[in-house]
């Protein structure tokens, strides 16, 4: 019987950096991968065979983060030299310089519409920028230590930040007001990202753990202790059902969020694994670290289970910034500690705020508030249907495996 889960496979690797790689990002089309390095350079790797890579130099110190804009017309990079650069990802490598902070800039993140840029810095601040005007919109100063990472939610309504002050802060992107502060019980988080549904966040921590938080109820949903050293980065699969992590223990881990278990451990890097990223389609992912090479993997394990569900989500939702997959050895729960709550409702859409204080009506005379509510209910029903479909697939797979085991047992007894 063929399994619905196939192991991830290493497709290719790229070498060209002269020091540890700190950050990765796929272009929206999946045709390019950008990487930043301690060697102060940004490189853009073309996935087409025999295509040359672009090397961009301009930063005066280590590059800490890179990200493509949603249109792929720009590539942002941050650096320890306290600046941010916006590059045109072509052979010329032209860039615009932002003198952003008074300390090292740790991360950059484009908003879903590509109009804004979010930066986090060792100067303990988060800054929101207008990409077009190249001006600061506002500065947020609620952290009291280095801010390691700040991200926009896929739906554009929220922002999240993590700091060495051992807090995770959730912000309203429109009002720029602090909504909630999560306190980390162990070490500090060096990386944070939103679930594709914008309902949860995951943090990568210095205490070797990964935590998944529900931002609606402000509760800890899942807690994974699967690494033996600090977790440096993570990336959600676009389906929202798997989470990829990179650690200083040199391994990559793939977590099944629906079942709350470790699915694969990937070995390949020599030394610390510092960054991971799924492609927007989810069929590939990339990893990199102190061994100065970018590894590109074919996801495989997710293609049978969730490709149809992912397509359904695209048909019903506005596409959001997403990522790709991994490879390795199947893992069971034994020997690994996890604290898990079900994520079956994790894809539920966030409720939409009413746009104006006045009742609005559409062309058919139906109140806008009622239309919005009905659309939200329909969205919730779609998510429920997709979740049930996934559970049915898993149940069928389990039944098939059980049947095969019973047949093998019966055959063994017959032979003896």
Swiss-Prot record:
Q: Which family does it belong to?
A: Belongs to the WD repeat POC1 family.
Tell me the protein's name. POC1 centriolar protein homolog A
Which Gene Ontology BP terms does the record give? cilium assembly
Question: What's the stated role of this polypeptide?
Answer: May play an important role in centriole assembly and/or stability and ciliogenesis.
Tell me the domain of life: Eukaryota
Intrachain S-S bonds: none
Give TM segment ranges: none
- Whichever gene encodes this chain, its name is poc1a
Which regions are annotated as WD repeats? Answer: 16-55, 58-97, 100-139, 142-181, 184-223, 226-265, 268-307
Question: Pfam families of this UniProt entry?
Answer: WD40 (PF00400)
Task: Give the Gene3D superfamilies listed for this entry.
Answer: YVTN repeat-like/Quinoprotein amine dehydrogenase
Q: What PROSITE patterns is this protein classified in?
A: WD_REPEATS_1, WD_REPEATS_2, WD_REPEATS_REGION
Q: Which GO terms describe its cellular component?
A: centriole; ciliary basal body
Keyword annotations of the record = Cilium biogenesis/degradation, Coiled coil, Repeat, WD repeat
What InterPro entries does the record tag this protein with? G-protein_beta_WD-40_rep, WD40/YVTN_repeat-like_dom_sf, WD40_repeat_CS, WD40_repeat_dom_sf, WD40_rpt, WDR55_POC1
- Coiled-coil stretches, from where to where? 380-412
The ranges of region (Disordered) come to: 311-340
């Amino acid at each position: 019987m063929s399994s619905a889960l196939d192991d991830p496979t290493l497709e290719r690797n790229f070498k060209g950096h002269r020091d540890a790689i700190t950050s990765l990002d796929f272009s929206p089309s999946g045709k390019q991968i950008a990487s930043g390095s301690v060697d102060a350079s940004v490189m853009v790797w073309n996935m087409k065979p025999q295509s040359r890579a672009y090397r961009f130099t301009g930063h005066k110190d280590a590059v800490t983060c890179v990200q493509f804009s949603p249109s792929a017309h720009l590539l942002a990079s941050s650096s320890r030299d306290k600046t941010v650069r916006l590059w045109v990802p072509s052979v010329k490598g032209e860039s615009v310089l932002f003198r952003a902070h008074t300390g090292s800039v740790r991360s950059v993140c484009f908003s879903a519409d590509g109009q804004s840029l979010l930066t986090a810095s060792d100067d303990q601040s988060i800054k929101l920028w207008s990409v077009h005007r190249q001006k600061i919109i506002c500065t947020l100063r609620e952290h009291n230590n280095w801010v390691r990472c700040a991200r926009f939610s896929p739906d554009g309504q929220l922002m999240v930040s993590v700091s060495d002050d051992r807090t995770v802060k959730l912000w309203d992107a429109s009002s720029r007001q602090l909504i909630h502060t999560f306190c980390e019980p162990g070490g500090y988080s060096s990386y944070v990202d939103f679930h594709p549904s914008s309902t949860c966040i995951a943090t990568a921590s210095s205490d070797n753990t990964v935590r998944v938080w529900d931002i609606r109820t402000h509760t800890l949903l899942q807690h994974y202790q699967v690494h033996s050293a600090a977790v440096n980065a993570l990336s959600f699969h676009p389906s929202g059902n798997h989470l990829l992590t990179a650690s200083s223990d040199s391994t990559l881990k793939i977590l099944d969020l629906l079942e709350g278990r470790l699915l694969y451990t990937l070995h390949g890097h020599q030394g610390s694994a510092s960054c991971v990223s799924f492609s927007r389609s989810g069929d590939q992912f990339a990893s990199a670290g102190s061994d100065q090479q970018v590894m590109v993997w074919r996801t495989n394990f997710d293609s049978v289970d969730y490709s149809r569900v992912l397509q359904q989500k695209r048909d019903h939702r506005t596409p959001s910034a997403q990522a790709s997959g991994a490879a390795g050895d199947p893992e069971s729960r034994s020997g690994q500690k996890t604290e898990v709550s079900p994520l079956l409702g994790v894809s539920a859409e966030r409720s939409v705020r009413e746009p104006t204080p006045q009742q609005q009506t559409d062309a058919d005379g139906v109140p806008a508030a009622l239309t919005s509510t009905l659309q939200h209910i329909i969205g919730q029903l779609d998510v429920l249907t997709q979740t049930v479909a996934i559970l049915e697939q898993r149940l069928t797979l389990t039944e098939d495996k059980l049947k095969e085991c019973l047949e093998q047992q019966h055959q063994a007894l017959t032979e003896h």
